[in-house]
Regions:
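Nucleotide-activated donor-binding/catalytic signature segment of Leloir-type glycosyltransferases, i.e.
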Residues: 178-204
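Conserved donor-binding/catalytic core segment of Leloir-type glycosyltransferases
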Residues: 129-146, 151-154, 164-165
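N-terminal pre-catalytic "stem/leader" segment of glycosyltransferase-like enzymes
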Residues: 1-54
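Acidic donor-binding loop of glycosyltransferase active sites
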Residues: 214-228
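Carbohydrate-associated surface elements
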Residues: 99, 121
Length: 324
């Protein structure tokens, strides 16, 4: 486990990261932990794997430098990709979606011949038959990505047989981040707690969240954030939930052909109207034969194509080729 320990130790000790790796359980950090779990130690030999950080000091001259970039071009941690000197010191940049790679090539002029796409992955989710007494919605991503709009839409719908479960908190990125940003969303969380048919759970560890997803019907996500992949959507689809979201960022790439995807409207008012229509349609048609047939195919395909059984082979092959 010497090589894996080296990779994790470097991530843990990287003080230039905006959040502590050890304390953070966001999508990128969780993906690195799962990669470490599913690959043999020898795969990481002579590899310097850098997660979401373009700090020059992280380059190691005696190793193959691989930047694993989950961030959109507007994130501070990606900004140094504008430096040709830094990019020249990298051997490879791994992106989590075609959309994200294309944006980086366009914005930073990243050489195509040193960039590759390896999609995110999940551990397979066993299917549990959904309850039929009511429709349960879930929002299980960070609060700034669309929770305010969802809460407004949910209030306007005012449906007695529909419950909204909110699993959202800034603590997901650790104490330092929570201390800095937590107060910003306190009023929104309080609104969740005081809204009819809404249950606020805060941060849920992934194991608990997966068990909750199995009982949910719809991932209600009016995304206002340029997702570069969206693990929350992948896990929801694998658990048999219908995903109702926007086409912002890589969501179309991630959720097609199964998700109910609406065009992202630039004003909140327009987005609320369009999203309300789409969500209501999804609620009303959830138990239809067509929807159930689609969701069965969805969970089978997503569990198959996004499984670490598949992705670990891709990573092993990539590292082997990178060493040649």
């Amino acid at each position: 486990m010497e090589e894996k320990s080296r990779i994790l130790k470097k991530a843990d000790s990287d003080k230039s990261r905006p959040v502590s790796f050890k304390e953070s359980f966001g999508g990128s950090e969780s993906q690195l932990r799962l990669l470490i779990k599913h690959l043999p130690d020898e795969s990481f030999k002579n590899i310097n794997l850098i997660l979401n950080n373009t700090n020059q000091d992280l380059i190691e001259k005696d190793k193959i430098n691989v930047l694993w970039m989950h961030h959109f071009v507007n994130q501070k941690e990606a900004k140094n990709l504008i430096s040709k000197d830094f990019v020249n010191k990298l051997d490879w940049i791994v992106y989590n979606s075609n959309w994200n790679r294309e944006q980086h090539i366009k914005y930073f002029k990243i050489p195509k011949n040193k960039s590759v796409v390896i999609r995110n992955a999940i551990e397979k989710i066993n299917y549990l038959e959904k309850p039929k007494d009511k429709i349960s919605l879930i929002y299980h991503t960070t609060p700034w990505r669309g929770l305010k709009i969802l809460l407004k839409v949910f209030k306007n719908l005012n449906l007695d047989n529909v419950k909204l479960n909110v699993c959202s908190s800034t603590i997901i990125y650790g104490k330092k981040f929570n201390d800095l940003m937590g107060n910003t969303f306190e009023n929104l969380f309080e609104e969740c707690k005081n809204t009819k048919n809404v249950e606020y759970f805060g941060f849920q560890e992934n194991e608990k969240l997966i068990e909750q997803l199995k009982k949910m019907h719809i991932f209600a996500y009016p995304s206002t954030w340029p997702e570069t992949s969206c693990i929350a959507a992948i896990e929801a689809m694998a658990a048999g939930c219908e995903v109702v979201t926007t086409d912002l960022g890589a969501l179309n790439e991630t959720c097609s052909p199964f998700g109910k995807i609406i065009h992202f409207e630039k004003t909140p008012e327009e987005l609320e109207v369009k999203y309300k229509e789409a969500l209501l349609e999804s609620i009303n048609n959830f138990w239809s034969e067509a929807t159930q047939k689609k969701l069965k195919l969805q969970r089978e395909k997503i569990n198959e194509t996004y499984s670490w059984d598949v992705r670990s082979v891709e990573w092993k092959n990539f590292f082997s080729e990178a060493k040649k």
